[in-house]
Amino acid sequence: SRRQRQMCIRDSYIYTLKMKTLTLLFSLFLMCPLSVWGQSADELLSKVSDALSEGKDDYAVSLFRQAANAGEDRTEMFYWTNVDKSSEVAPRLADVLAVHYKEMRNYDKAYLFYKEFLQRHPEDVPALVSCAEMEMMRGKEKDALKTYEKVLMLDADNLQANIFLGNYYYLQAEKDKKKLEEDYKKITSPTRMQYARYRNGLSDVFTNSYGKAKAYLQRVLQVFPSMEAGNTLEKIKKMELELK
């Protein structure tokens, strides 16, 4: 199911997400003076403007992140109206908003800002993975499919992309196989030609969808010892033997 696919993808990177969060909190503690904490979004954004004008990009990004937490609407408006989109810091600020909205589960806004970031860094794998996840959460599985395929062109062993594509093609194959079987069972006295057509249909499903699922899931096992991927590969192997 879609929910199972979503959970699978979430589980695959939750540890990395936790570590990134801890690193981020530690960095904020080191970079921000105590006076920053507890300020309003407008106060923080005023400091962001000052930091940007002084060329202190790292400090500006840190303040911008705090501003997003203090008031996301004001911070987003600041991004659209006060940030030079051609500057080096602009995509970093877009990424701050993308991550913030993702954490707030505002997937439409998160998707918007990941796309904004990717305009400047179209081959950034972590951003592409996050963008694909947002596409999936917004119900755009076909778009997520294309984005994950792009991820694998850049990083063939990417775990999340291989998990998603492996599960996607396996579930698609199961759906196609079920329809073939149901249609064949409706025939009360199948002829040899009808049986041959049925077997050819199964063979096509295996060669295409099951075959793709197998390739992606085998890659998953090369990177991560996933029990679920192993079980699915066993099912595919069993069907392969039945078709021979």
Give each language-model segment a name:
Residues 78-91, 171-216:
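Short coil/linker segments at helix-helix boundaries
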Residues 76-78, 93, 127, 161, ...:
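TPR alpha-solenoid repeat register
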Residues 74, 90, 124, 158, ...:
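Residue-level recognition of tetratricopeptide repeat
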Residues 2-9:
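Short, small-residue-biased leader/transition segments that mark boundaries at the very start
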Residues 36-81, 87-92:
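N-terminal leader/linker segments that initiate helical-solenoid repeat arrays
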Residues 137-139, 166, 171-180, 241-244:
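Short coil/turn linking the two alpha-helices of tandem helical-hairpin repeats
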